[in-house]
Amino acid sequence: MPKVFLQSLGCNKNLVDSEIMLGALRDFEVTDIPKEADVLIVNTCGFINSAKQESIRAILELCEIRKKGSILAVTGCLMQRYKDELIKELPDVDIFSGVGDFGEIDKMIAGKLSKFSDETFLQKNENRVITGTNFHAYIKISEGCNQKCSFCAIPSFKGRLKSRDIQNIVSEVEMLVERGYYDFSFIAQDTSSFGRDIGLKNGLISLIKEIEKINGVKIARILYLYPTTTNKELLQVIIDSPVFVNYFDMPIQHINDEMLKIMKRGNGKAEILELLQTMRAAKNSFLRTGIIVGHPGESEEYFDELCRFLQEFKFDRISVFAYSKEEDTASFEMKQIPQNIIKKRLNKIAKIADRAIDESFRALIGTEQMAEICGFSSEGEFFYGAKLAIWDFEIDGEILINESELENVEVGGLYKIKITDFVGGKLLAKIIS
């Protein structure tokens, strides 16, 4: 059986696309050793400069170590964004493809053909291979974005919002439930806009109601809410849901009114605060956000306001990014902030974020929680790694459970645990039942 090596870079939306490719390549044995592979695939990220550099390095490394006669394919966002330049600059790559043909990768490999379709998503896919877990899956509900954020180039290569049909999404979840999956994270560039392009006024609410009807879905969460398309009605539907947990992931990017205007984020500070307070008031809520520092126009005064806000409003998780100057964005032509200042601000805000995350972890000590066993931990085979049921898979932390204390524990199982300590950035716990 021929072997395939697939390197998936970037976000969890890219991971879904990679899993679709693995589904199309079921006749191949998957290997994590590139030198053994007959086919090598890099699914690239082209969002910001650091991600682009990582993608290029990965491609060049595989060009160096691939075995003679193997096929190297490069797919994904970077290819979609810089198609002409990369085809010219990477003569050792055999197949090029963008973001619309993942389900056709087997045909492209068989014919050694490159392909770039106008479509940037798949409506329906029945052969996807879920990686890394036997209980959790990401479900992509739309592709593209209608927002006009000043710093973001995604609409330039992903296109405008294109929502999947609700029944197609339901069918995918039902299929995965039949295969044993029970925990689902619903993702998109802007999940709260779902359905607006196909005439659904409250598309995400409608989707939530349909997912709740599926027998076997135990846990679900929504990622990537956008402030201007999120309202209290949607939040209340999540809060009242018997299936969707009170997990609120809404990147705010900044909190200063003038910066929000410069960044073309739509809502101002007051509207964002109202949404965040509603989220925080929900029982057992978990709040995640994203912040950009160093965007053109960010004065010391605006930055200080952001720092004070993050110290006062306690998020559970904060992802912090340095502004990246990107072509095809409004901020590309703006007066840029020097890199040394951006780096200084990034370091300061990262420390604030780390303290907030640390406090969120420590607040769990002594509590009883529902958790899922993910497998042996990153610390080695003496511990099982687990995540709280409310957390997203991999990104929100790992809980260590001593393997020697356990009998008949099932990987992928849902258990009641007691958090006992927080050591070295990780929670320790024991299974109660």
Swiss-Prot record:
Keyword Magnesium carried by entry: no
UniProt record, GO biological process: tRNA modification
Sample GO molecular function, one term: protein methylthiotransferase activity
InterPro entries named in the record: Elp3/MiaA/NifB-like_rSAM (IPR006638), Methylthiotransferase (IPR005839), Methylthiotransferase_CS (IPR020612), Methylthiotransferase_N (IPR013848), Methylthiotransferase_N_sf (IPR038135), Ribosomal_uS12_MeSTrfase_RimO (IPR005840), rSAM (IPR007197), rSAM_horseshoe (IPR023404)
Entry binding sites for [4Fe-4S] cluster 2: C145, C149, C152
Pfam (any one): UPF0004
The protein's required cofactors: [4Fe-4S] cluster
Lineage: superkingdom: Bacteria
UniProt-listed Enzyme Commission number(s): 2.8.4.4
Domain Radical SAM core intervals: 131-362
Disulfide bond sites: none
Keyword Iron carried by entry: yes
Keywords linked to the UniProt accession: 4Fe-4S, Cytoplasm, Iron, Iron-sulfur, Metal-binding, S-adenosyl-L-methionine, Transferase
Localisation per UniProt entry: Cytoplasm
Positions bound to [4Fe-4S] cluster 1: C11, C45, C77
Cofactor binding note from Swiss-Prot or TrEMBL: Binds 2 [4Fe-4S] clusters. One cluster is coordinated with 3 cysteines and an exchangeable S-adenosyl-L-methionine.
GO cellular component: cytosol
Reaction equations catalysed: L-aspartate(89)-[ribosomal protein uS12]-hydrogen + (sulfur carrier)-SH + AH2 + 2 S-adenosyl-L-methionine = 3-methylsulfanyl-L-aspartate(89)-[ribosomal protein uS12]-hydrogen + (sulfur carrier)-H + 5'-deoxyadenosine + L-methionine + A + S-adenosyl-L-homocysteine + 2 H(+)
Stated family: Belongs to the methylthiotransferase family. RimO subfamily.
Biological function: Catalyzes the methylthiolation of an aspartic acid residue of ribosomal protein uS12.
NCBIfam families, sorted: 30S ribosomal protein S12 methylthiotransferase RimO, MiaB/RimO family radical SAM methylthiotransferase
Listed name of the protein: Ribosomal protein uS12 methylthiotransferase RimO
Organism of derivation: Campylobacter hominis (strain ATCC BAA-381 / DSM 21671 / CCUG 45161 / LMG 19568 / NCTC 13146 / CH001A)
